[in-house]
């Protein structure tokens, strides 16, 4: 995993559009994605927007709640890790796993 100490800048606008189109009933999701502007860490198939150290442990920033799925014509299936308080912890690009 490549940890970006300074928070590599990220443009989530394409994700906001997908969320508005595919999950309009989740009115909080576009704004939750819009604040994902710095990458904490990344692998070839995953972008972390929140520090994943000690997930779901007391004091950890990463407290998992659910997964949401978006489909992108170029990137394929995207799995969003949604944390407590409607935060997006990261995105897994399933097409990059194979």
Protein language model annotation of sequence segments:
Residues 1-65, 75:
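N-terminal domain-onset segments
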Residues 63-98:
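Short, compact, well-ordered microdomains
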